Amino acid sequence: MKIDIMTLFPEMINAVMRESIIGRAQDKGIVEVKATNIRDYALDKHHKADDAPYGGGRGQVMLAEPLYLCHEALSGGEHVHTVFLSAQGAPFNQEKARELLAKEHFILVCGHYEGIDQRFIDECVD
């Protein structure tokens, strides 16, 4: 099983993954977990991954472009089951865990700020 995690804080994710049950599972070759920095796919020189929401509103929203490019790199252009981790979504439970366990590869998208660009959610999230 391969789990890719799209995040702005890969070092934090990797630290937890090395020191947990998942770390032992990785050592045994049961699962491969990789955290990828979304900023690495920003096209500007400052690696900007956020901006004010289109149409106004408060806060910052993660930009669609670096999200798309990161997702494309991780999925290799193939459909890979993608989950956006958000407080607005359905609660994670044992049934959802079993569904993910059946996947050979899936991508977890960690949001930040006020959220992420809805266009990315509509296009890439299952």
Regions found by a protein language model. Give the residues of each.
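N-terminal nucleotide/polyanion-binding subdomain common to many enzyme families
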Residues: 1-74
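Hydrophobic/aromatic beta-strand patches that form the interior of the parallel beta-sheet core
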Residues: 4-6, 34-36, 81-83, 106-107, ...
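Generic recognition of short, well-ordered alpha-helical segments
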Residues: 16-20, 95, 119
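Short, solvent-exposed amphipathic alpha-helical segments in soluble enzyme
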Residues: 20-24, 98-102, 123-124
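S-adenosyl-L-methionine/SAH cofactor-binding core of RNA-modifying enzymes
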Residues: 61-112, 117-118
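Structured adenosyl-cofactor binding patch, chiefly the S-adenosyl-L-methionine
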Residues: 116, 120-126
